[in-house]
Amino acid sequence: MYQEKTAGTKNAFTGKPNPGYATYLPIQSSLGRPLEADGLTGDFKLITQRDISHCKSRTIVDYWLLAIEPENGVIINKGDADRLGLKDGDRVKVVSATNPEGVWDFKNGVKKPMIGRVQVTQTVKPGVVTFNLGFGHWATGASDVTIDGKVVKGDPRRAAGIHLNAAMYTDPYLKNTPLQDPVGGSAVFYDSKVRLMKV
């Protein structure tokens, strides 16, 4: 199949023509370079998931759900955990090639380390780590906020757990932009690689 309309367009980053036929385009930097060519490597592929008890970021404010699952963790295959000497409940920092500090930097003087508890399972493929979305907040009532000179105290239960989007790769040339899928243009959520450091 050939699509003339697509074949007549160019990649906005590289200036190269887009293929007008079905093909696989690997995830790449904005300059069209393979991730490995820019040093974007690691030990584990990082993916995200949702759990039925906390399916959205806003569910952290639901104390009935917090009673069921008060904290998420860094989910890892048992074979990988054994190889690294990790067990359930151990704390690890998650780092990547574009976030070697393993922190969320809010650019206001506040940083939050990406440290979470290990959850060992057989439900994740070896070489992959994942985490349930909806945890690791710094807002949504998790931190103190000053309103009209009065401090509204945050609830530390809302800050529990870990959120790892900041470990996902940023484009090595654009710096402050996530890697983008060269076809769909969305952020690349499943191609970052990370390392786990026991703390």
Language model feature labels by segment:
Residues 6, 62-199:
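Long, contiguous, secondary-structure-rich segments that constitute the structural scaffold
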Residues 1-64:
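Long, low-complexity segments enriched in small/aliphatic residues
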